[in-house]
C-alpha cells in the first residue's frame, strides 16, 4: 500500500468518527459551548468543512493559500447538515489530491504559518486534515462527556 492510500484511509475514517460524534450530541447542544472562550461542536465542524479546501490548494500548489475570508466561509456553514455535506465533499476532493500526490514529492518541504511558522514535509502535510479531524474528535467527545453521555459513539 502506498503511503498516500493509508493517509486517505485514515482521513476518511477520522471524518466518519467526527460526524458520528456530532450526530450523537442532542441537536439542541450541537452549538453549545461550556465557556465563552470554548468552541461548540458545530463551530469545530464548520472549520472541518472548510479546511480541506486549503489543504487541496497547498498540496496542488506547494504553498499555503490566503485565509482572507476564512471566518465568513465558516459562518456560512450555519447548520449541522450543511457542515456535514460540505465536510464530506471537501474531504473527498482532498482525498483525491492526496491519492494523486507523487511519491517523489513526499520529502519536499513547505513553510506553514501555524505555531509561529513551521516547516513540514509534504508527507506530513498530506496527513494534516486527518490530524485536525482527530484533534477535534477528542474535543467533541469531551463536550459529549460534559453533557453526561459517557458512551463511545
PLM regions with names:
Residues 8-12, 16-19, 27-72, 112-153:
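Short, contiguous alpha-helical
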Residues 1-5:
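Basic/polar N-terminal segments that are highly enriched at the extreme N-terminus
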Amino acid at each position: 500500500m502506498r503511503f498516500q492510500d493509508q493517509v486517505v484511509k485514515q482521513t476518511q475514517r477520522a471524518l466518519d468518527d467526527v460526524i458520528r460524534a456530532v450526530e450523537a450530541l442532542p441537536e439542541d447542544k450541537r452549538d453549545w459551548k461550556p465557556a465563552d472562550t470554548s468552541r461548540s461542536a458545530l463551530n469545530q465542524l464548520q472549520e472541518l468543512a472548510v479546511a480541506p479546501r486549503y489543504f487541496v490548494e497547498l498540496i496542488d500548489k506547494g504553498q499555503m493559500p490566503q485565509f482572507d475570508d476564512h471566518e465568513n466561509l465558516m459562518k456560512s456553514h450555519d447548520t449541522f447538515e450543511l457542515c456535514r455535506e460540505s465536510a464530506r465533499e471537501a474531504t473527498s476532493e482532498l482525498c483525491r489530491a492526496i491519492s494523486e500526490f507523487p511519491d517523489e514529492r513526499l520529502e519536499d518541504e513547505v513553510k506553514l504559518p501555524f505555531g509561529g511558522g513551521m516547516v513540514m514535509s509534504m508527507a506530513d502535510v498530506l496527513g494534516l486534515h486527518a490530524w485536525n479531524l482527530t484533534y477535534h474528535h477528542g474535543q467533541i467527545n469531551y463536550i459529549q462527556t460534559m453533557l453526561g453521555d459517557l458512551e463511545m459513539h
